[in-house]
């Protein structure tokens, strides 16, 4: 199984804390290289529309070249690892747990270009990333019965999410939730089950209206919506062709403290609707009209020139976590 996601980002960051004395002879393990990489990773996490926050794993290459006037161009090749924090989770990425290899880890390779003005500290950032999970063969080689990643749109995954959400809504008098995004699904063994992770939001519907495919529910007004991230296991066979009805399940939902104006508050309207699965697997994601305000709709280069990313002394840097 192969998953591919291309994340194309263009934006602007003002007020950098980096020194105006930009070194041009950086090696991948230098402190300054880590600062540049952190800037790129922070930007990715602030503008990523789906799934999980990313953490720096390896600085593969860094090249700093003079540009026009006071501008300096910093070219980076980065390897990132998926964390267990959803993009809506306000937890700083430094405190997020890296998804372990036995839980079918996912890596992301990114090319980043940062245009830095040494006088004003203004930055323009361009990032392009491809996300790929560990291969099923590698997962099973290291752990024969570890859960295997499924597509978020897999029927068993979607059915499991709907089943758990309906059970929750039945128990919450006066509160109805809908799915914002199905972020992850896995097939588990001994006992056989489906493990799912998904984000939900409270909506202004009655329970009856929520079950009506012709009725469109909307999140509560700003400041009133409750957003939660759920992890659940539904115990059922992969061979089962019917939707779950009376299966045993375990679930845990945590309310996320997403403030109005938070970098990802746009996700509420971006995702709301039935069967909202993440497009991050087997798909390409690019900026369109619905992207956050920080994006600009104009032609941008899609590749970072190889002449700026040729291997340099001291690169690649050390592996901070593990290599897939």
UniProtKB/Swiss-Prot annotation:
Site annotation Cleavage: residues: 140-141
Domain of life: Eukaryota
Compartments, record wording: Secreted
Key words, A-Z: Disulfide bond, Glycoprotein, Metalloenzyme inhibitor, Metalloprotease inhibitor, Protease inhibitor, Repeat, Secreted, Signal
PROSITE patterns: CYSTATIN_FETUIN_A, FETUIN_1, FETUIN_2
Glycosites: 204, 282
Matching SMART domains: CY
Residues covered by the Cystatin fetuin-A-type domain: 22-130, 141-254
Tissue expression pattern: Expressed by the liver.
S-S bridge residues: 28-315, 85-96, 110-129, 143-146, 205-217, 230-253, 287-291
GO cellular component, one term: blood microparticle
InterPro entries the record matches: Cystatin_dom, Cystatin_Fetuin_A, Cystatin_sf, Kininogen_Fetuin_HRG, Prot_inh_fetuin_CS
Motif Cell attachment site boundaries: 23-25
Gene3D superfamilies in the record: 3.10.450.10
SUPFAM superfamilies for this protein: Cystatin/monellin (SSF54403)
GO MF annotation terms: cysteine-type endopeptidase inhibitor activity
Signal peptide interval: 1-19
PANTHER family, per database record: ALPHA-2-HS-GLYCOPROTEIN, FETUIN
Description of how the protein assembles with itself and partners: Homodimer.
Stated role: Suppress hemorrhage induced by metalloproteinases from the same venom (brevilysin-H3, -H4, -H6) and from habu venom (metalloproteinases HR1A and HR1B). The non-hemorrhagic brevilysin-L4 is not inhibited by cMSF. Does not inhibit serine and cysteine proteases such as trypsin, chymotrypsin, thermolysin, and papain. The inhibition may occur by formation of a non-covalent complex between this protein and the proteinases at their metalloproteinase domains.
Family: Belongs to the fetuin family.
UniProt protein name: Antihemorrhagic factor cMSF
Species the sequence originates in: Gloydius brevicauda (Korean slamosa snake)
């Amino acid at each position: 199984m192969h998953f591919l996601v291309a994340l194309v980002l263009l934006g602007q960051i003002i007020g950098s804390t980096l020194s105006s004395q930009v070194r041009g002879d950086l090696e991948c393990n230098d402190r300054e290289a880590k600062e540049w990489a952190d800037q790129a990773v922070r930007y990715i996490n602030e503008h990523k529309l789906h799934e999980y926050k990313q953490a720096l794993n390896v600085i593969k290459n860094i090249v700093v070249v003079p540009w026009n006037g006071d501008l300096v161009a910093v070219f980076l090749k980065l390897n990132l690892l998926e964390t267990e924090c959803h993009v809506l989770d306000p937890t700083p990425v430094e405190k997020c747990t890296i998804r372990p290899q036995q839980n079918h880890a996912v890596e992301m390779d990114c090319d980043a270009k940062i245009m830095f003005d040494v006088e004003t500290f203004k930055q323009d950032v361009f990032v392009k990333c491809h996300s790929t999970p560990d291969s099923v063969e590698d997962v099973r080689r290291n752990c024969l019965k570890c859960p295997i990643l499924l597509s978020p749109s897999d029927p068993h995954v979607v059915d499991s999410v709907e089943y758990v959400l309906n059970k929750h809504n039945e128990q919450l008098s006066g509160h109805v939730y809908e799915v914002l995004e199905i972020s992850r699904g896995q097939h588990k063994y001994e006992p056989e089950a489906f493990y799912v992770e998904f984000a939900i939001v409270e909506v202004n519907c009655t329970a009856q209206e929520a079950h009506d495919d012709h009725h469109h529910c909307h999140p509560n007004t700003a400041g009133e919506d409750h957003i939660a991230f759920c992890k659940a296991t539904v115990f059922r066979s992969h061979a089962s062709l019917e939707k779950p009805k009376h299966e045993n399940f375990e679930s845990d939902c945590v309310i996320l403290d997403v403030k109005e104006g938070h970098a990802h508050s746009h996700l509420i309207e971006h995702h709301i609707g039935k069967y909202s699965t993440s497009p991050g697997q087997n798909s390409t994601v690019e900026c369109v009209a619905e992207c956050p305000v920080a994006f600009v709709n104009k032609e941008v280069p899609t590749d970072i020139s190889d002449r700026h990313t040729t291997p340099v002394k001291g690169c690649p840097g050390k592996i901070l976590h593990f290599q897939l």
